[in-house]
């Protein structure tokens, strides 16, 4: 395993000590080179002493100093040396101290006599073949000679970042004489999305250091020369055009006498003899221009944001759905002979180095000690890397299975029943190939089960129960096929003796036989307790009773390695009986006989979500606590009534896990950290309640066909079923209405696309099958956006299922034709009402057995199929005109992301009008962001600039001018990528430190809080690596916390990192990325870089147009913020325009007479005064006053404030306007917007579903907060003399949002 990790490290450009960079940026304290730990959150174990070491080198610069921690491993120090600019020519060496070799895997503290200012010596080692290959790969990457790697998994420009492009565009505009005064000039609020927003700008290539470097045709060395130490032969062509044949020898590298036609690998004689231990040094000797060009390449690379260039090793890179054309400079295919040799260089001749025993690695990692903090860091770090490696390998294998590249182990079985083994991963299809789910819904049930199994495995991995093991599990959706990849559990294929069960715990062969091996009771008991599963009875086919700790479907297997494995975790929660009875899939349901009908729900695997169980448990627990308090109160008459609040709080604190701001997808909340508990003030005994007496658990086998035998069993089972029914009713009667109410009142962050809507529903414990009910509940103007989004999500999911049916058994070369035709039938009917499929008949003839039924699809038949799927899956009837109301671009994005489609970036014409309008328009550029690439849907951005014709690629010219009769052609589908579901656990240690830091800040322990936050940052970076979604979320969370602490420089740096990492791992147009851009803009404005801030906000608004379209409810406050920033730049007239735009959206969403509109009218009136439009200012203030008077009454503070302003404006409008200008600078110190105006998602837009108060860093109740108007009045009157750089009050601070770094809405 270590061997493979070294190969991976060597092949990666990611420095291991990058974590220190963020520590240096986040604080002025001394940072640790390799991310050494700060004082730990439990106060028990320090991160180790930090000191400086001197490393003595064999060549210049002869000595370097590095900062290390006594707790670091020597291996980490070694890796740091490899990555430092002055020493990266070294890769094959060991370290010595006082002449003694130091073991790479011991900690620094374990090396005798190694203290501060000690000297260690770097000693070059003889190469092995493997070390030589690693060295060559590394040098190729360092000198820029490595082309793009062959990648069968990740798509075109995967892991791209746009931040450099966004920033450089603003810089380039500022450098011109005709530059606009600010980035918002000419912004079209109602314009359609511009696809070029999603692509990075084309960049000039870096300087070439050598023409080529590759493995020589003479490679590998013959036997007799291997005996003499020859390892590899290379061929190098320098920039001067000279070609050299180089021998890689155990002693280093030297130029040999071979030529293209003659083999003589002996060293050349003087004066042409050149040799060196490092290939980098040898190239410098051979090429006079190498040094200068290599220096230029380093400068070129240093000009880029480092995070945007590092290889992503611990996460799956994001795959954009819009990509440059195949001929664009960003993706142009280059000749590189070594690309075909890379597998050999990485894995050797036998290719055996990449074969890993995944199961053994998973389980041995789980068995690592976790007693100390250092143990936990090492264990979680290894776990994170292992899951990333496995997910990558399993996804690659799944694609090969889907493409038919791997032979099945059982070729005589039906296609869906075939199984495969590749790269030590076991693959099967997510279909009911052998009839296991025949009674549950067949293929549809099997497909749902494997998806839920991944979620169950992730939950168990997160719980980390000693002695219980799970196989590595990944589900891959690719071109309509669902493929499951699992690590091979020892003994799972073992033939059992007669009478011996294949499974040791749970159901065997359906549910006829039930195994209940006592060995599994203890571990399953822990699992069930954590998942709130009740121990219950089940009965086999002979009516024999078995008491199981978990669901009968959850199986235990004793592996031949002696470990206890838990399998089939798709039923860890009970069935949603209310839904099943409604749709007729419940057992004994009168509708069940019609289950095969077109309108019947497709399967019976409709379980409730773990988050719902968690939410219901909290409700019941609070009820129980209140009951216990009442009982105590009756028993202790001396207790004061005022203590009740404290008692409830104490009980809640004692009973609930730490309030991590976001339940995970599997519903498990982060554990409360020890610091958290330590920080709590001690409570009197009488105020505490032992919640150990509170019992709540659900029977997951309720309503699943169990047959109790005795009356007592029947009574208990009926009680279990009633408890499950209550949970289902809680979902419908409480959770769903509360969510809709929160969104209606603007109290939480509003979703902006299907992914964020799904995440919000899941976080609340709502299954996506309730999208139809969400759409039905979204009644009225205020919830129109939610209804449109829910309908769009149902349509896109229905299209995914329809397309999957056509794609599943289609040969790969015909899939582009199928996808293009289906997209034309869905989105291109306004341009062509009867599109014809474009199929290459010559290719189709090669597959006589292929099912080409997609050719028969028409827009009408597709519409009917989608309506049928929406009705079946969501119980929602689309109205007859739904196709007229779809948002073309947004729906295209949704279906592309769900199917993994990568489309060429070009103007897509959805209507005849748009095609006519853009017929004369110049073509889109290859990867540069320009207005011309706007897809032409129902609205277009009319402001177009002339293009330089030389920027356009030939392919783009043809596609733009060809006047195609259809919207999509097969050539537009450039690639399809897999959609991956995986089971990686999150780091509990890093989350504990983050939560402890946040709690310390809330308790005004600023120094301790900052130390813990830095500790959490260091842990996140160490455990996940720097490029990971969880790290992006902690960067964003910490940037907001530092922003509130007035640490603007640190906040800015962290916010930039949050943007880049989320772009590269979540997507350039992901909702979290968009929100990160908005936060970055706010922090940039607070740091005095208002023009740059407006650039970021403009980019976010451009993304919004693509993701949602114009007029998103959350954009009200974003536009309002931009208006205030424009005031800061003294652009009063433009600022007024932006306030008016914000008001217009607010009136559309909330109504003209809403309090939100009144507050915006109040601000607009001030903006009009600044713009010297006194008459309009008076009118707007009067409107504001009238609304406040009607809605809140004459005595309300807001009404009085508006009345006061109205009087002042009316009495002396000119004087007020002048006065307002005088205090404008003070006013712009902070962006102050009423919380009702911000709708719960503004300067600190919540991570979809976060409350306004939590986001703004305050704990006030919901409702209109008159302080914002009061404070604004003080600003305008000049009574607040704060300077611009003073810290913002907590209430106007941005929301903390994002994944593990946001406070979830209750």
UniProtKB/Swiss-Prot annotation:
Quote the biased-composition stretches of kind Polar residues, using this chain's numbering: 12-33
Q: Which domain of life is it from?
A: Eukaryota
Basic residues biased stretches: 1285-1298
> What GO cellular component entries does it have?
cytoplasm
Keyword Lyase among record annotations: no
What Gene3D superfamilies does this protein's entry cite?
Answer: Hypothetical protein (hspc210) (3.30.2280.10), Tetratricopeptide repeat domain (1.25.40.10)
List the subcellular locations.
Cytoplasm
For this protein, the record's PROSITE patterns field holds:
CLU, TPR, TPR_REGION
Q: Name one GO molecular function term.
A: mRNA binding
Location of the region described as Disordered in the Swiss-Prot/TrEMBL record: 1-47, 630-689, 912-956, 1275-1306
Q: Where are the TPR repeats?
A: 1032-1065, 1074-1107, 1116-1149
Predominant cellular place of this UniProt entry's protein: cytoplasm
Chain intervals with Low complexity compositional bias: 1-11
SUPFAM superfamilies, from UniProt?
A: Hypothetical protein c14orf129, hspc210 (SSF103107), TPR-like (SSF48452)
Composition-biased stretches (Basic and acidic residues):
656-689
A single GO BP annotation from the record?
Answer: intracellular distribution of mitochondria
Q: Which UniProt keywords are listed?
A: Cytoplasm, Repeat, TPR repeat
Domain named Clu: residues: 336-580
Nucleus as UniProt keyword? no
The family line of this record is: Belongs to the CLU family.
Quaternary data: May associate with the eukaryotic translation initiation factor 3 (eIF-3) complex.
Q: Which PANTHER family match?
A: CLUSTERED MITOCHONDRIA PROTEIN HOMOLOG, EUKARYOTIC TRANSLATION INITIATION FACTOR 3 SUBUNIT EIF-3
Outline what the protein does.
Answer: mRNA-binding protein involved in proper cytoplasmic distribution of mitochondria.
Q: What is this protein called?
A: Clustered mitochondria protein homolog
> What's the encoding gene here?
clu1
